[in-house]
Amino acid sequence: MNQEEINKFKQNFEFLENEIGKVMVGLSDTIRLTLATIFAGGHTLLEGAPGLGKTLLVRSIAECMGLSFKRIQFTSDLMPSDVTGTQVLSEDENNKRTFKFQPGPIFANIVLADEVNRAGPKTQSSLLEAMEEKQVTVLGHTHKLPQPFFVLATQNPIELEGTYPLPEAQLDRFLVKLLVAPPSASELNEILNRTTGQEQAKIKAFANKEESTKAILQMRKLVKEVIVAPAVQDVLVSMVFSLDPNSNTCTSLVNQYVKFGPGPRGAQAVMMISKVLALLDGRANIAYEDIKTAIIPALRHRMILNFQAEADGVTADKIISEVKDAS
C-alpha cells in the first residue's frame, strides 16, 4: 500500500459522500459509517422512526454506486421464498416440464430489507445464510449471490406496534447498527427547500456497474491491508473484555446491567470499521481514535442487557461510552 492508493481511496469515498449528501440532509455521520461498512465488506442495520430518510439513503447509495438494487418490503405475511426465490414448473422448447429456479429479490448487489422487523422470525432468518455465506439454498440447491453483495436493513424502534425484535443471531450478522435521529429545525427547513420545489437534486453515478464493482473490490482489498499496531489491538481487546460481565476487568455498570457482552465478531467489526476510518484520514495504520469512533456503532447491537437496565433507562450506548472514555 502506498500513499497514492490511500489518496485514491479517500477521493472515491468522498465523491460518494458528496453525491449522496445532495439528497440527504443532516445525516453525514450515518452516510459515512454506512459507506464504511460497505467497503469493510459488511452489512448495515439502520434504526429510526418512519419518514427519516432511511430508505432514501439506501436507494441513493445504490444509484451512486451504479450497482444492481432490489428492495424487499418486509410484512407480517412475507414468506422466506418471497426473499430467496423458489422452484417453478415450466416447459422447455420440447414441451417437457421441468423445475426452474426463479431468483428472489435477494439476488442483487445491494438489497434493501425495508422494515425488517415487521416480518416474523422465520422470514427474518431467511436473510441469515445470504448475509453470512453470500449464497442461498432452495430445496437443497445452493445458488451463489452476485458480488459485491450488501444488505442494508431498516427497522422501526421496538416501541412501535407490529414489530418483531430481531433475534441475536441475525443482529450479529450486521457489522454496524446506526440510529437515525430526527432532523433539527434548520435541517427540516433545508429538507423542505430541497424536496418541495421544482428542481430536485440529481446524483451522479460513481461509474458503470462493471467499473464500480472492480473499484469496490479493490477498495475492500486496500482496507484489509491497513496495519494495526499490537498496542492498539491490545486496547481494543481490553475494551471488549471490559464489556463482558464474566470478565474480571468488567466495570460496575457492565456487571450490574449486562447479561451478555460482545463476542469475537464484535471485535472484528470494530477493527474493520477502524481500518476504513484510518484510510479516510490518510493513514495506513489504525489510531486509538479510530477505535473509539467505531466501537459504539459496531457493538451497540451485540450487547444483551438485563431487565434492570430497561427499568433504569440504561442503554448499550451509555455502557460502551463509559468503557470507551475509561480506556
Residue ranges and their predicted role:
Residues 5-9, 23, 172, 177-253, ...:
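Conserved C-terminal "switch" segment of AAA+ ATPases
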Residues 49, 83, 154:
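P-loop (Walker A) phosphate-binding loop of NTP-binding proteins
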Residues 7-52:
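Pre-Walker A (pre-P-loop) alpha-helix and adjacent loop at the N terminus of AAA/AAA+ ATPase modules
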Residues 2, 245-327:
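C-terminal engagement/docking regions of AAA+ P-loop ATPases
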Residues 90-94, 119, 123, 131-225, ...:
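Canonical AAA+ ATPase core
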Residues 35-76:
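Walker A/P-loop
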Residues 48, 114-115, 126:
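Walker B catalytic acidic pair
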Residues 33-36, 90-112:
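Conserved alpha-helical scaffold flanking the Walker A/P-loop in AAA+ ATPase domains
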